[in-house]
Amino acid sequence: MIGVTLAVAVGGALGCLLRFATSNWISAHWPQHFYAATLAVNIAGCLLIGYLYGQFLLRPEVPLALRAGLIAGFLGGLTTFSSFSLDTLRLLESGQAPLAFSYLAFSVLGGLLATWAGLILTKL
């Protein structure tokens, strides 16, 4: 069990670092679009979780440490619902309600579509 715990910790650290780097890069290039980094990592994370889920269904022999490290660790560290919620609130507070609701809808629908697309990729 220590191997699984370590895999989740390492995966989480790597996912957090990638999210942090993505956020910094997008903020440096498009500071007015602060929410784009959260949207990007959440949609990418949904695509990856759909793909990994499909792969793990096809390959049940994949070790638990690898599955947990990638899904609970890496994708758990990469994606973030709390940042998504804060970004939406900031848009609403700044009087950008149409953008806030567009962001909300695209995040949810885009996330579902990306997860489905990731699962479909395993069948190609």
UniProtKB/Swiss-Prot annotation:
User: Which key words tag this protein in UniProt?
Assistant: Cell inner membrane, Cell membrane, Ion channel, Ion transport, Membrane, Metal-binding, Sodium, Transmembrane, Transmembrane helix, Transport
Q: Where does Na(+) bind?
A: 76, 79
Q: Membrane topology per the record?
A: Multi-pass membrane protein
Q: Which reaction does it catalyse?
A: fluoride(in) = fluoride(out)
- The answer on whether this UniProt entry bears the keyword Transmembrane reads yes
Q: Care to name a GO molecular-function term for this sequence? A: metal ion binding
- The membrane-spanning stretches of this chain are 1-21, 34-54, 62-82, 101-121
InterPro entries given in the database record: FluC (IPR003691)
State the Pfam families in the record: CRCB (PF02537)
GO terms classed as biological process: cellular detoxification of fluoride
Main location per UniProt? membrane
The subcellular location is: Cell inner membrane
Q: Among its keywords, does the record have Membrane?
A: yes
Provide the Gene Ontology terms for cellular component. Answer: plasma membrane
Q: How is its activity regulated?
A: Na(+) is not transported, but it plays an essential structural role and its presence is essential for fluoride channel function.
Question: HAMAP family annotated for this entry?
Answer: FluC
Family label: Belongs to the fluoride channel Fluc/FEX (TC 1.A.43) family.
UniProt xrefs under PANTHER family: FLUORIDE EXPORT PROTEIN 1-RELATED
The protein's job, in short, is: Fluoride-specific ion channel. Important for reducing fluoride concentration in the cell, thus reducing its toxicity.
Name of this protein: Fluoride-specific ion channel FluC
